[in-house]
């Protein structure tokens, strides 16, 4: 069994049993497996996604900001490496947007909310029947309001109103 598959198996064990040691071991094996999957490896994207998911799960459990920071870094790399017509692009954009919003809620850093807004806007380019598109329409106005509260740009009010109107269609 490869390190990658072992990591995924331990992550599944954690999801079923809730034993934090399983999640810690899964993260250790994900980290090691990634070393054997350089940027040119065809399965690196899957490793990045699953590793980021494990770190986000541990962040949800313990609130350790380093886990969230690393998950964001991994998701950014996954977004960079993904093929042009990657079928799970909207899921990847959504996961990164969620992670950035969580980090913004903790530190109120302008670059986090701005990047999250950019990801929400990219999700608007998804097909109308993609559930992540409608999810983005629901969350974009609040993110724009939060950014406006930080920098006072009135254009965020207009964009937020337009997004809210689209979500009602």
Residue ranges: model-predicted function:
Residues 17-20, 32-45, 62, 77-90, ...:
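Flexible helix-coil transition and linker loops at the boundaries of alpha-helical arrays
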Residues 23, 30, 68, 75, ...:
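Hydrophobic/aromatic packing residues within the alpha-helices of TPR/SEL1-like helical repeat arrays
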